[in-house]
């Protein structure tokens, strides 16, 4: 039997798809590309925006149209957040949520065997539920591995449906995480990314913490680099920063969630910090890790309900002043099921798109300036995708993308390079 996967959304979703693929393979399935045709089609959905829901439905329709005898599966955040709507999708033979992923295989077998024509198996998240283990030992990119350490979010930001889709915070046991890191190191992975729905919440429910986890992860032989997923500034303490700065294997690149550079807009979003508080945390990171050694990246939403032109200009000025290496800019997407859906003073679509273009232009200018300033510096780069026998793509510890000329080296090695010119997308670099 052959199975095909289609993944929407974040790194956690991508990690979970890989784990599901591994689960299917362990039970006799062969994972194939969509073009090769399959007996089972699985879409792991994202529901952050309505557009994500639409893409999930579109892919299911195409899979069913082109392979009418196949079993189609809709799983993940979309059905979990909107179970009644998802259950009515005719093109989905199996509908499951973001929990109890191990049951997907059993649900699929019921349809394959003719026991059921449709299975809807969406179980509500409960406070006190445990982290669901989904072992993952290999990745398409054999250089960087993503390790999920936490699920769920206890916050209630006005624009976000994720707590509804993912349930409450629940942390994976440190023992399980370290066991996975050892397996990954034995398989040749030297860089790992700790991912989560709410990474700084790790350990809040178990009496541990993120800094402690990083310290112990760094002790795993063979793991040379550790990266962190998204962090909330108000949850990063002075002690966390001090302890993280003492871990040499930790890459000094921090995705510090902002969402808006206007304190007024942050209040409307129900984010629990001001721009002044955000700037203070960013300054502490720069001081602890070194101004030239650290990079900070972030996300920014433009066109949130009630955002005036002045609010937007304040946001753009703050973002430019923070000198982020990379900024993901999103026009606000009105999401049913969130408080902001009903907020007054919705910003017109054309204005949101205009603000998105203006913000993007501003942050790309800063990105280019930072890349040009790095020219001539020495950096450590993990060689990733080979472009030829001597050219590789990769990233510095600060997550600056590079193309490295490295004759005699191979993917998966960490090499010392001299950074060169920025071409608008990557720095040219030469291995020393």
State each model region's role:
Residues 160-167, 225-234, 260-270, 285, ...:
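Conserved strand-turn element in the central/C-terminal portion of the radical SAM core barrel
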Residues 342-432:
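Terminal RNA-binding accessory module
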Residues 256, 299, 319, 327, ...:
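Hydrophobic, well-ordered secondary-structure elements that form the walls
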Residues 186, 211-225, 236-298:
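Radical SAM/AdoMet-radical enzyme domain recognition
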Residues 1-202, 239, 244, 250, ...:
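Proteins enriched for Cys/Gly/acidic motifs involved in redox and nucleic-acid/cofactor modification
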Residues 47-52, 189-220, 232-239, 266, ...:
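Conserved glycine-rich "GG(E/T)P / GGGxP" loop and the immediately following alpha-helix
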Residues 307, 322-324:
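Contiguous mid-protein beta-loop-alpha structural module that forms a pocket-lining wall or clamp
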Residues 2, 67-68, 220-227:
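Short, surface-exposed connector motifs at secondary-structure boundaries
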């Amino acid at each position: 039997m052959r199975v095909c996967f289609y993944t929407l959304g974040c790194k956690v979703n991508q990690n979970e798809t890989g784990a599901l693929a591994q689960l299917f393979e362990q039970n006799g399935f062969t994972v194939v590309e969509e073009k090769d045709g399959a007996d089972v089609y699985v879409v792991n959905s994202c529901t952050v925006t309505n557009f994500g829901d639409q893409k999930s439905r579109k892919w299911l329709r195409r899979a069913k149209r082109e392979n009418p005898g196949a079993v189609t599966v809709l799983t993940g955040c979309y059905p979990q957040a909107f179970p009644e709507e998802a259950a009515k999708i005719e093109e989905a033979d199996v509908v499951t949520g973001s929990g109890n992923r191990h049951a997907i295989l059993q649900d699929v077998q019921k349809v394959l065997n003719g026991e059921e024509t449709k299975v809807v198996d969406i179980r509500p998240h409960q406070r006190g539920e445990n982290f669901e283990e989904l072992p993952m030992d290999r990745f398409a990119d054999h250089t960087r591995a993503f390790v999920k350490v936490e699920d769920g979010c206890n916050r209630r930001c006005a624009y976000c449906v994720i707590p509804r889709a993912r349930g409450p915070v629940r942390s994976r046991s440190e023992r399980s995480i370290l066991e996975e890191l050892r397996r990954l190191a034995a398989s040749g992975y030297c860089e790992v990314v700790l991912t989560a729905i709410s990474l700084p919440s790790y350990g809040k429910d178990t009496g541990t913490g993120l800094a402690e986890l990083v310290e112990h992860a760094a002790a795993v032989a063979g793991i040379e680099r550790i990266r962190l997923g998204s962090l909330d500034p108000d949850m990063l303490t002075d002690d966390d920063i001090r302890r993280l700065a003492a871990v040499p294997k930790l890459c000094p690149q921090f995705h510090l969630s902002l969402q808006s550079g206007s304190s007024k807009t942050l209040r409307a979003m129900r984010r629990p910090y001001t721009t002044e508080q955000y700037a203070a945390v960013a300054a502490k990171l720069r001081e602890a890790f070194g101004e030239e050694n650290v990079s900070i990246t972030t996300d920014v939403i433009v066109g949130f309900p009630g955002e005036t032109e002045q609010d937007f200009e304040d946001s753009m000025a703050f973002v430019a002043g923070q000198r982020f290496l990379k900024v993901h800019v999103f026009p606000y997407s009105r999401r049913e099921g969130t408080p902001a859906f009903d907020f007054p003073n919705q910003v017109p679509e054309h204005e949101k798109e205009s603000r998105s273009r203006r913000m993007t232009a501003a942050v790309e200018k800063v990105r280019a300036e930072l890349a040009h300033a790095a020219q001539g510096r020495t950096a450590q780069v993990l060689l990733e995708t080979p472009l030829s026998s001597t050219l590789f793509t990769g990233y510095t510890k600060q997550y600056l993308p590079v193309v490295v000329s490295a004759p005699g080296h191979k993917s998966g090695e960490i090499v010392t390079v001299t950074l060169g010119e920025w071409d608008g997308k990557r720095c040219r670099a030469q291995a020393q």
